[in-house]
Amino acid sequence: MAPEMNNKLSYGEKKRAYVTFLAGTGDYVKGVVGLAKGLRKTKSKYPLVVAVLPDVPADHRRQLLDQGCVIKEIQPVYPPDNQTQFAMAYYVLNYSKLRIWKFVEYSKLIYLDGDIQVFENIDHLFDLPDGNFYAVKDCFCEKTWSHTPQYKIGYCQQCPDKVTWPESELGPKPPLYFNAGMFVYEPSLPTYYNLLETLKVVPPTPFAEQDFLNMYFKDIYKPIPPVYNLVLAMLWRHPENIELNEAKVVHYCAAGAKPWRFTGQEGNMEREDIKMLVEKWWDIYNDESLDYKNFNVHCGQKEDVHRKPKTLPQFFTDLSEADVLQCAKAPSAA
């Protein structure tokens, strides 16, 4: 499905960056600030690009600029009209992430959700061979997957031998499926336009853009170890597959796990390993020595910062008023 990703810069040194996505007026900006500081702590050589929808307010954009982020405003991407029930209402926003394929001023990008923290340098992932889509395999064991045959029969690709896939009853085993909260990809205009055209003819499914990206890139998907996107549910679903002290990237995607909202009251949030990971996130967020010190004018970005946020269509406005229009996170096993 994916066209050749060969839209390279033909001159100068390859540009690389990390990229994340932010929407709405909620508190998810704290996650992105924390991510920027985490990348700085690991001494990453590359900037953090934040793709923002038009409704992200000026004060949030200023916070991100003050942390050295590059702001790139994008327009929403809407799925075809249908009656799909998304696993979470705000997953519909995630289709806007497709816009990051048009950031062709960069030769390679690593996408990270705003509820992710990077605890060890992962710049080496930029050196993975071109032409592939790299991400970590997801887990099918949480209730958000209850609509799938995998969940119903207890099958998970994290432990495929525990419950084998019944080919005689359900047909061929599903292809490998990644969590779209973190992935390594190459921007490409041909791919970007083909993604948008394909979206017009592929019916939306419960996990929104994550299902779509899995379908689109299935032929070039290459799994990478779970240390590069530790989905928290792995700690209680597949502890045998996890060495917590080796995790380089932690994805705070379980219900109640967002550090800036953490109460410890939701299921599994009383675990000591979860509390430790939340504390590690706060240690980075509160570390003033990690703040980006930039005494120069933010050239070329003033217009984005001071422009009055645009009003999105009524559906997005309704989500915002319901306090769910925030940074779109990838669906996960949690």
UniProtKB/Swiss-Prot annotation:
Active site: K97
Binding annotation for Mn(2+): D113, D115, H251
Signal peptide (residue range): none
Induction: Induced by cold in a DREB1A-dependent manner; this induction is accompanied by a reduction in trimethylation of 'Lys-27' of histone H3 (H3K27me3) in GOLS3 promoter. Induced by methylviologen (MV), a superoxide radical generating drug.
Gene3D superfamilies: Spore Coat Polysaccharide Biosynthesis Protein SpsA, Chain A (3.90.550.10)
Chemical reaction(s) catalysed: myo-inositol + UDP-alpha-D-galactose = alpha-D-galactosyl-(1->3)-1D-myo-inositol + UDP + H(+)
Cofactor: a divalent metal cation
Cellular-component GO terms for this entry: cytoplasm
Primary localisation category: cytoplasm
Record-linked CDD domains: GT8_Glycogenin (cd02537)
Manganese found in the keyword field: yes
Alphabetical list of SUPFAM superfamilies matching this protein: Nucleotide-diphospho-sugar transferases
GO aspect biological process, one term: response to oxidative stress
Keywords, alphabetical: Carbohydrate metabolism, Cytoplasm, Galactose metabolism, Glycosyltransferase, Manganese, Metal-binding, Transferase
Annotated family: Belongs to the glycosyltransferase 8 family. Galactosyltransferase subfamily.
Function summary: Galactinol synthase involved in the biosynthesis of raffinose family oligosaccharides (RFOs) that function as osmoprotectants. May promote plant stress tolerance.
Designated name of the protein: Galactinol synthase 3
